C-alpha cells in the first residue's frame, strides 16, 4: 500500500516556472510512482492531467471560492469523505475513508497556512523586519489553530489514519511537533529524514 502527497502548485497554471512541460512532468512522476492513494495540494481542475489509474477521487472545495483546492485520488472505493474548512484562511483539509484489507482506513490531506514569503521579505535587509517577524508569528499561530481543527475531526474518528500534508514548515517547528503527536513520520522511518 503506497501513498503520495504532492503540492502541485496549480500544475504551473500561471507559468511561475518558465516551462510548458510541468503538468506532463508531474503526471509522469505520478505514473512512475503509481501510489494507491494520491493527495494533491493547490490542485487545479482545469490544468490537472487525466489520472486514469484512479477510479475514485474527492476534490474540495467543490467550487473554488477563495480556497486552495485539494484532491485525493484513490484506487479503492471511497466509503466516506469530509472537508475541514480552516477558519480565516485560503487553506483547508479533506479526508476519505477507504477499505484496505477488509479494514476501514482514513486518509487526510491537509494544507497548512503558508508564509507567503516573497523576494522583498528578509529579516536582514528589510527595514520592516519587525513587521516580517509579526507576519511569521501570525502564520505560526494560524498553523497551530488549523492543527487544532484537524485534531477535533480526528478525535471522533474510530479508524486508523494516515495524514498527508503540505506543512509549510520544518520538522523542528511547533506545527510539526503538534501534528506528529502519537504518529509515525513515514519520511523519517524510511531513513531519509
Which positions does each model-derived feature cover?
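Generic enzyme active-site microenvironment
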Residues: 5, 39, 164
Amino acid at each position: 500500500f503506497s501513498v503520495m502527497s504532492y503540492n502541485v502548485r496549480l500544475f504551473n497554471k500561471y507559468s511561475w516556472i518558465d516551462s510548458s512541460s510541468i503538468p506532463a512532468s508531474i503526471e509522469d512522476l505520478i505514473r512512475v510512482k503509481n501510489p494507491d492513494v494520491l493527495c494533491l495540494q493547490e490542485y487545479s481542475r482545469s490544468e490537472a492531467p487525466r489520472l486514469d489509474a484512479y477510479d475514485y477521487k474527492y476534490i474540495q472545495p467543490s467550487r473554488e471560492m477563495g480556497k486552495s483546492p485539494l484532491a485525493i485520488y484513490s484506487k479503492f472505493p471511497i466509503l466516506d469523505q469530509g472537508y475541514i474548512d480552516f477558519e480565516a484562511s485560503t487553506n483547508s483539509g479533506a479526508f476519505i475513508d477507504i477499505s484496505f484489507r477488509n479494514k476501514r482506513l482514513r486518509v487526510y490531506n491537509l494544507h497548512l497556512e503558508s508564509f507567503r514569503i516573497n523576494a522583498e521579505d528578509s529579516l536582514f535587509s528589510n527595514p520592516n523586519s519587525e513587521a516580517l517577524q509579526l507576519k511569521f508569528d501570525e502564520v505560526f499561530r494560524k498553523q497551530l489553530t488549523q492543527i487544532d481543527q484537524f485534531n477535533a475531526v480526528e478525535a471522533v474518528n474510530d479508524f486508523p489514519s494516515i495524514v498527508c500534508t503540505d506543512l509549510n514548515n520544518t520538522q523542528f517547528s511547533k506545527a510539526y511537533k503538534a501534528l506528529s503527536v502519537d504518529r509515525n513520520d513515514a519520511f523519517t522511518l524510511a531513513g531519509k529524514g
